[in-house]
UniProtKB/Swiss-Prot annotation:
Entry superkingdom: Eukaryota
Residue numbers of Phenylalanine amide PTMs: F81
GO molecular function: toxin activity
Name under which the protein is recorded: Toxin CjTL8
Compartments where located: Secreted; Nematocyst
Keyword presence, Transmembrane: no
Position of the signal peptide: 1-20
Function: In vivo, induces immediate paralysis on shrimps (C.multidentata), followed by death when high doses are injected. No activity is observed when injected into fly larvae (M.domestica).
UniProt keyword annotation of Metal-binding present: no
Propeptide: 21-44
PTM remark: Contains 3 disulfide bonds.
């Protein structure tokens, strides 16, 4: 009886692990500057802000894509160190 409970608990853990979404690690992208913060993926950068940089989603950062398809938008990155 206790072995059945152990098997059931193991199955529940495996199902929970299978359903968990993997967290995207942006450090894996060489073009992503970790000194930048991504504010929003669906707005263009404010041209009045000198510290904001627009980066294209396609090719540089895989942010704001749906199933790997590029929406043609830009992401707004703000350099935390004021460069």
């Amino acid at each position: 009886m206790s072995s059945a409970i152990k098997i059931l608990a193991l199955l529940m853990v495996l199902v929970a692990l299978a359903q968990a979404k993997p967290r995207k690690d942006y450090r894996a992208y060489p073009d992503f500057d970790d000194k930048s913060v991504i504010l929003e993926d669906d707005k263009r950068c404010d041209p009045d802000k000198r510290d904001s940089v627009c980066k294209d989603v396609c090719g540089m950062l895989d942010i704001g894509t749906e199933n790997g398809e590029c929406p043609g938008k830009e992401v707004c990155c703000v350099d935390l160190f004021g460069r």
